[in-house]
Amino acid sequence: MLDESSSSDESRATELPVSSEDECEEVTDAKVLPNKVLVVFEGESTLFRDQLLDTVFGVQDQGNIVKQLSWDTKYYAVEYDLYVDECVDIHGWLNEVNSDDYEELRDLLTMIIIVRSFDSTQDTKEYNSVLYDFIQGNSVSVISVNTNSARQVKDTYDEFLELDASSIEFINYHDDRVEKETNECKGMARLKEIIDTHPWTDCKVVLKNKESTSDKVNKPDLEYLIDTLKKAKIHYQKLSNGSDGFSEEAEQFALQMATDIANNL
């Protein structure tokens, strides 16, 4: 847990600093605040904590709260705060964060990354149920990283994706392959790719391909636009509700992407 002197119930998330009264009082305009990314490690998955935080976020032994980080890609940069937590039982942790006491925290979060080692033969149904309850009422993106074997990951992830592919992504920590047919990365490379294409909201995103000079007319970056359209199509399909219509979240995402692309033409 973030606070070693906290309650003996280690599955609780009540000591998360982002929910403190002092910080909540500072929130005057959420639209100018950095998005908050929360990474939680369950049980033995804490063994991968240092490596994951360094590989994905470039954070090395900087405690449980790292503010004013910048996620930089070739085309944009966005400021965010990183929060790190540990728990013994992710089911209790998710239920706690999904309670009314944590409504303000959930409103500030843009992404939760759950890192855990789980066995599909033991706790799939319970984990499914807790995740389903959590994602139904929240707009935060959830990424589940399994540090268990690749075989168990495959079996479990297929079942999860049928549950709700629109709101959660699943990654095998140990998988470093690249799919030949789709050229899609796996493992930590996939995690970074998901963050690259994450629809950041309520924060300042600085586009990098908007520079112009007085003697040269700005031309659209076709490679960027094509790549963006491909990723947007995949994300939009995941946001569909599986019927003839599409979810409100999918429609909002489509509108946002159309605006972003138009601004780069």
Curated annotation (Swiss-Prot):
Function as written in the Swiss-Prot or TrEMBL entry: Involved in gross chromosomal rearrangements (GCRs) and telomere healing.
Entry's Gene Ontology BP terms: vesicle-mediated transport
Keyword Metal-binding: no
Gene: IRC6
Protein keywords: Chromosomal rearrangement
Lipoprotein as UniProt keyword: no
Recorded family membership: Belongs to the IRC6 family.
InterPro entries according to UniProt: Irc6
Chain positions covered by the region annotation Disordered: 1-21
Pfam families: Adaptin_binding
Protein name in the entry: Increased recombination centers protein 6
Gene Ontology molecular function terms on file: protein-macromolecule adaptor activity
